[in-house]
Amino acid sequence: MKELEEKIKEYGTVLPGNVLKVDAFLNHQVDPQLMLHIGQKFAKLFANEGITKIWTVESSGIAPAVMTGLEMNLPVIFARKHKSLTLNQNMYTADVYSYTKKTTNRISISKKYVDADDKILMIDDFLANGQAVEGLLEIADQAGVQVAGAGIVIEKSFQPGAGELKERGIRVESLARIQSLSDNKVEFVKD
């Protein structure tokens, strides 16, 4: 997605450890117009899949997931990272390791919002090693729901996440695919 790649070039910052900081438009400050276009693109890519719900992990996946839900007229469920006093024990849970924060979080989705006949689309801001998507897949397995695929805003193609998901038969659609973050420069995969 050209518009997204331009935003990354203009506002993205490469940090040590192959971390791409995009807090100017995605992870802290959110560009609503860009998120709308991202939602429209995912809606088009997954239009004929019979999707019933969109899942993401809080918090940076919420904006693109909500815009995708808006475009597809579908509810969005975000997996919570922290236990809430308002959420009871009727939860599906999975442990997810965060590459950027170097911590493990237990994510959870209330069973109340999951139906046995659901077909879900997973949306996430980044795909590097695939931990967040793997956590959502684990919850999908527990719930017995079908998975249509994963819509990824930014994929680090030089890390194994996308390849491993595709090997498992998961459809992965990434809007910006990064080949390298060497020398503090973002280099995109050339299609």
Swiss-Prot record:
Native organism: Limosilactobacillus reuteri (strain DSM 20016)
Subunit structure: Homodimer.
Domain of life: Bacteria
Listed GO MF terms: xanthine phosphoribosyltransferase activity
EC number: 2.4.2.22
UniProt record, GO biological process: purine ribonucleoside salvage; xanthine metabolic process; XMP salvage
Pathway, per record: Purine metabolism; XMP biosynthesis via salvage pathway; XMP from xanthine: step 1/1
HAMAP family: XPRTase (MF_01184)
Residue numbers binding xanthine: 20, 27, 156
Reaction equations catalysed: XMP + diphosphate = xanthine + 5-phospho-alpha-D-ribose 1-diphosphate
Its job: Converts the preformed base xanthine, a product of nucleic acid breakdown, to xanthosine 5'-monophosphate (XMP), so it can be reused for RNA or DNA synthesis.
Major subcellular location class: cytoplasm
Keywords in alphabetical order: Cytoplasm, Glycosyltransferase, Purine salvage, Transferase
Positions bound to 5-phospho-alpha-D-ribose 1-diphosphate: 128-132
InterPro entries found in the cross-reference section: PRibTrfase_dom (IPR000836), PRTase-like (IPR029057), Pur/Pyrimidine_PRTase (IPR050118), Xanthine_PRibTrfase (IPR010079)
Full protein name: Xanthine phosphoribosyltransferase
Recorded GO CC terms: cytoplasm
Subcellular localization(s) per the UniProt record: Cytoplasm
Membership in a protein family: Belongs to the purine/pyrimidine phosphoribosyltransferase family. Xpt subfamily.
